[in-house]
Amino acid sequence: MQIDPADALRLDVLHALGTSATGASFATSSGDVLDVQCYGAGAFRLRVGPAARADYGIVAARPQAATTTQSARGAWAIAAGDARLDIASGPLAFRLLWKDRLVLCSATDHDRTGAPRLPALGRVRQGGLWSAAFALATGEPVYGLGEKFGALDKRGQLLQSRVEDAQDVNTSRSGTNTPFAWSVGTTQGAWGVYVHTPADVTHAIGHPDWSHRSYALVVEDDALDLFVFAGDQPASILDLYTQITGRPAPVPRWSLGLALVRARDEAPDASAVAATRFRERRISADVVALAGDAFGDFAASIVEGANAAEAPAWLAKLRERAFRLCLRETAEVDVDSPLFHELASQQYLLATDEGEPYICARAEGDEAQATWREFALVDFTHADAFAWWRDAHASVFEAGIDVVSVEARTEVPDDVAAWNGDAGSRLSNAYALLHTRCGFEATARYRTPGGGAPAIFATAGWTGSQRTPLAIGPFAQADWEGLAATLRGALSSGMSGVACYAATVGTDLGERAPPELFVRWLQAAVFLSHLRLAGGGDRDPWLYGADAEGIARKWLTFRYRLIPYLEQAITEATRTGMPVARAMALAFPESRLVRDFETQFMCGDALLVAPILREGGEIDVALPPGAWYDLNTRARYAGSQVLRYAAKLDQFPVFGREGYALPLGRGVQHTGEIASDLPLEALWVFGKPVRPLEGFRQARVESDRIAGFTVRALLNVDVQVFGDASSVTVLPL
């Protein structure tokens, strides 16, 4: 999209209409009212335009107290805590300050006459488009915007926030989108911008076609609704953003185990046989994601009322081997299904302007034997349709399914008419949010008792989807660039408030990965919050050769040992919004050295992971400030340096952070073998502790308020100290 500033009405503030305990409102030159509200120290909301239509419950917070003042020059200031938003007129300009330091302001790009080239706020005369623009300093990076597979630093990119079937990881198309961006700033503090809308948003982040010195955005909605954030560091911005849009929910322990994604054309009994082989070969796994037609067409299974009494033998076989079962679903209802006529008669389907069910069509199958399929989409904006679809899951859960995987294979057409009055152009992104929300509520209501917290797997999402974990990435091309892009998608999602993200090891796209690539992909995914393994055909671990199978077994065993640690990281996410896998710019924003190493990441607070992205096992590792212990050799390395690292195929570059501790469980075949109250087997302590460790009955690191921190552990916990053991006090618990 190109933007011509001449097409926009440049908004200016004429005068204040009034103030309140939480903000102020202003008359503008376009006749619209600009409403500014505080949502806590460091969070301000700016709304202008007609009364908003359906917002789909995205904002989960309320305005908070602020102080509003006017200077002698007529500028207004709204302040709360250490943050202040200044609003000036002639022309309209914003300044966001943190601790009296400027962190963000409206665009400073001027034309030859001295007039702003990009308005702070603008409205296209024909309506339906709004713009906003913010200044960028030279070298100022910008991150976020959801699941994007290119560079994490979005500076110089032109991107769209729009939910699409990504299909692969080679373009900017993605399923999980969030119109939320942030920057580490320029030593003054961090800032963030969130566009509150279900509509498409185009972002030009220092893009030269718009302005290399500005972050400009265009919103395809009837009103403009922005949040701006200020804080000390990016973690503070994520905290504010997830306060506003919702914290991630907890996940069940079994979801942290390996999920086996079976091929779409694999019969359920064949999936059961393959899963049995995982147990026989002692390769740890917890979930089997069945093909979409495991119970027949998902909608048809609802009509048939599948129940436990009718459960086939293959399902019983999986249950006997302690596997959790995942069923893929879409909200597509075939026109030939009896369910189509039932839902159409109740107006539970997205419709045309004339009120008839909107019929979508798609070719399916191999190109030579493709069949044309016609279907309609459930209208989740209709409260009764939402409840009907949610409750219809009862029979599927009763049949033995533990979780559903919501797959958005169809983009909502722009000319669809929804029950709530929205057209498809405004519903398309929210549809993924609503479908996932419906499936999550169904899981919470009907899942098997004792299965832990509810969860749902989803290939698509919008702002707010982080409340209903978890997101799953698309299949990637089976080469080294596919691995790198997969990691960037996971890390970009984490930088956008998505705390839990499942990357898929391997692919169903074309040829399988070579054994070396398969191993490196698996090793990297072990340290993400969730991981899936593409299987079926020639893609199961034992089919890569005995060496690859043995290494896969080793690292999956370590994955299961990490589960107590991962659970702690997810608990932190539910409180702060920090993802489990943290890109360098998020974890160490003050270190320019590590920022450009965009496929490195922290797994929680204690582990630095440096995935190997090429043949041969060599990688450059940028060690952040501090000191780091190589988990392979236990060697200690000073931080703030780039290390050339070589790893044999059964090794992987992972480093423990000095001053931190790593709680580890036993190696198990599935999470059902983990003792709920006594999960620990070992505690690895990286040098002299400087941080507490809490939450476990078997071990903890606590401050003694005199000499520092003391490690206490039960006798059945193996405490291992990396580095100088004499510097660490270990006492019985």
Question: Model features per residue range: what roles?
Answer:
Residues 30-31, 72-73, 79-81, 90, ...:
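Short, well-ordered loop/turn elements at secondary-structure boundaries
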Residues 194-197, 206-208, 271-272, 290, ...:
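Composition- and surface-driven signal marking solvent-exposed, interaction-prone regions
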Residues 1-255, 259-276, 287-290, 304, ...:
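N-terminal accessory segment at the very beginning of proteins
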Residues 440-446, 454-455, 461-472, 493-503, ...:
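Catalytic core of carbohydrate-active enzymes
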Residues 23, 33-34, 166-169, 177-179, ...:
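Generic recognition of flexible, low-complexity loop/linker segments
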Residues 51-53, 106, 121, 284-552, ...:
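Aromatic- and carboxylate-enriched substrate-binding clefts and catalytic-loop regions
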Residues 240, 273, 384, 388-392, ...:
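A non-catalytic, amphipathic alpha-helix used as a structural packing/dimerization or gating element
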